[in-house]
Amino acid sequence: MRDRLKDPVKIFEINKGKRPVHIAAPMVRYSKLPFRQLVRDYNTDIVYTPMILAKEFLHPKGRYFDFSTNDADASLILQFGVDDPVILEKAAQLVGPYVDGIGINCGCPQTWAIQEGIGSALLDEPEKVHKLVRAVKSTLGESFCTEVKIRIAKDLNKTRHLMQVIEKSGADIITVHGRTRQDRSSFPVNLDAIREVRPCVQIPVVANGDVKSLRKGLEIAKYTETQGIMSARGLLENPALFAGYEETPWGCVERFLWYSTSYSLNFHLFYHHLTTMMGQMTTKRERMTIPKDSFASVMDWLDEHFVVRRPDEPMFGESVLPCRRY
């Protein structure tokens, strides 16, 4: 039985009128269990899995490869890439007992996703989105948290209509990415668009795009009048973002090392996470010397250059600044 207080809807209720809910975005490859555990240590309220293809999730090998969790992995929303309500019903039935919510991806702009009829291809099919929401609700119950993530359209009336369809379908949360599916990630997020469409529904709306710091996120929430803020790249660079740190604290790196070994994170993902979060505490030249062959060799490199505390040592995971060895 999942903890009712970890229900994403309950979290929005608890924070109403206080502060926006802090959310770690679904990131392909990167939103794995060790990273989810890490950002929770730093004031992240809700975390997502990477987008998982629902049709692959129906196969045991697909589930094993894409999804792992534990009792501490809450509040957790699993995001599906899906266009078939029947497949979604089956996938929801399999995963329902192990998550706190299911998200439906209607925002992925990648060409392959659009060709598959998932992600932002669904922005043009409100009726299908309605059926997908109903598939989750009919399978897991009306009280089970269901979220839909969308992008804005060039015609905001189209976005408003889709949001209203989503709300009437019974969804509990809508996340709005402030770029169109044609916009590159380097294109500035359109906060005015999020601000304009938010009042068209009564359920919580989350602003997504360019949340690179807590300060920036709070400014976005205030301007758009949204109830939540979602960060992706900002959290990759600084998993302690929602705790107010402007740069990754050293203790965050120590915790990440521990979680990665505890949950056997894929080495290539581990390497990318580590070098990204150490971007502001090391030079590019230094990072180029970090070994690329094994976790053990990376640990040797870190121990050679920094004081790295282990979980059984005082001040593990608490330091702000790294202590270098010279």
UniProtKB/Swiss-Prot annotation:
List residues binding FMN. Answer: 26-28, 79, 149, 177, 208-210, 232-233
InterPro entries, A to Z: Aldolase_TIM, DUS-like_FMN-bd, DUS_fam, tRNA_hU_synthase_CS
Q: Which PROSITE patterns match?
A: UPF0034
Instruction: Write out the GO MF terms.
Output: flavin adenine dinucleotide binding; mRNA dihydrouridine synthase activity; tRNA dihydrouridine synthase activity; tRNA-dihydrouridine20a synthase activity; tRNA-dihydrouridine20b synthase activity
Query: What EC number(s) does its UniProt record assign?
Result: 1.3.1.90, 1.3.1.-
Give the top-level enzyme category: oxidoreductase
Give GO terms for biological process: mRNA processing
Its localization reads: Mitochondrion
Top-rank taxon of the source lineage equals Eukaryota
Q: Does the keyword NADP apply?
A: yes
- What residues form the catalytic site here? 108
Q: Which cofactor does it need?
A: FMN
Q: Which GO terms describe its cellular component?
A: mitochondrion
Q: Which reaction does it catalyse?
A: 5,6-dihydrouridine(20a) in tRNA + NADP(+) = uridine(20a) in tRNA + NADPH + H(+); 5,6-dihydrouridine(20a) in tRNA + NAD(+) = uridine(20a) in tRNA + NADH + H(+); 5,6-dihydrouridine(20b) in tRNA + NAD(+) = uridine(20b) in tRNA + NADH + H(+); 5,6-dihydrouridine(20b) in tRNA + NADP(+) = uridine(20b) in tRNA + NADPH + H(+)
Enumerate the UniProt keywords alphabetically.
Answer: Flavoprotein, FMN, Mitochondrion, mRNA processing, NAD, NADP, Oxidoreductase, tRNA processing
Q: Which family does it belong to?
A: Belongs to the Dus family. Dus4 subfamily.
Q: What is the role of this chain?
A: Catalyzes the synthesis of dihydrouridine, a modified base found in the D-loop of most tRNAs. Also able to mediate dihydrouridylation of some mRNAs, thereby affecting their translation.
Q: Can you name this protein?
A: tRNA-dihydrouridine(20a/20b) synthase [NAD(P)+]
Q: What is the lineage of its organism?
A: Eukaryota, Fungi, Dikarya, Ascomycota, Taphrinomycotina
